[in-house]
Amino acid sequence: MKEKIALFGAGGKMGVRLAKNLLKSDYRVSHVEVSEVGKKRLKDELGLECVSTEAALDNVDVVILAVPDTIIGKIAAQIAPQLRPGTMVMTLDAAAPFAGHLPDRPDLTYFVAHPCHPLIFNDETDPEARRDYFGGGAAKQSITSALMQGPEEAFDLGEAVAKVIYAPILRSYRLTVDQMALLEPGLSETICATLLQVMREAMDETVRRGVPKEAARDFLLGHMNILGAVIFNEIPGAFSDACNKAIEFGKPRLMRDDWIKVFDREEIAESIRRIT
């Protein structure tokens, strides 16, 4: 008999995504949701009923916490006394585990699984897959996983569950929790999201200065495509001399000399503290 999974936050946006994919598996799933809105969403969209926490945790093998980072510690502390040794607690983000918000239970297995989301450069041909920017639906995406604590053989179970909830899968990478924290919030949010926000503000500024919005958007997104393909080695090539000169003078104008320190452990820890 396949393992029993308790999905907490099953009626949230992420929870419903996971519940939908779990329906395609052989896992035995119990759904837990406290809000009436979430219960209704789960019922309306997937025809699923929620159960009590006690029923969900009875002989459970894997507990998935599809809840906000800010309450993971609280929920984990509440359910920990009801979990038998060897139970896996899975979080969908490294923030709370990195911050030490999980209970001090050496006899539990802690597993973290986070999606990479569909790549900008991909080979999807189906229109639905090409429009699946988030992943877990039609487009393939890679995933990252970490076994924070627990027996080595537990990794296979955690990865197997992760491959189901985030399917379809392109590649699967095993990392440490610290490495996952470098990727998020470090690389994906502090760096990527911030610089994308700056690019959007820059585009808006060209519009304010008279460039038609559609022209500015096409120009920026098109250049992001080719420049990204070159700099991430998707295609052979090099930037023009003029472009390299613009980077040489533009980078110090835009970036502090010590920007790379956002990856220092203290900075990552402080960033996580702010969101948990």
Swiss-Prot record:
Q: Give the GO biological process terms.
A: tyrosine biosynthetic process
Per UniProt, the keywords (alphabetical) are: Carbohydrate metabolism, Metal-binding, NAD, Nucleotide-binding, Oxidoreductase, Plasmid, Zinc
A Pfam cross-reference name: F420_oxidored
Provide any one GO MF term from the record.
metal ion binding
Q: Which residues bind Zn(2+)?
A: 114, 184
- Its top-level enzyme class, in one word, is oxidoreductase
User: Record-annotated residues binding NAD(+)?
Assistant: 12-14, 33, 69
**Cysteine pairings via disulfide bonds:** none
Q: Which reaction does it catalyse?
A: D-apionate + NAD(+) = 3-oxoisoapionate + NADH + H(+)
InterPro entries attached to this UniProt entry:
NAD(P)-bd_dom_sf, P5C_Rdtase_cat_N, PGDH_C, Preph/Arog_dehydrog, Semialdehyde_DH-like_C
Q: Which residues form the signal peptide?
A: none
UniProt cofactor(s): Zn(2+)
The catalytic activity of this protein is classed by the Enzyme Commission as: 1.1.1.421
Cite the annotated pathway: Carbohydrate metabolism
Q: What does this protein do?
A: Involved in catabolism of D-apiose. Catalyzes the conversion of D-apionate to 3-oxo-isoapionate.
Family per similarity comment: Belongs to the ApnO family.
What's the protein name? Answer: D-apionate oxidoisomerase
From which source organism is this entry? Cupriavidus necator (strain ATCC 43291 / DSM 13513 / CCUG 52238 / LMG 8453 / N-1) (Ralstonia eutropha)
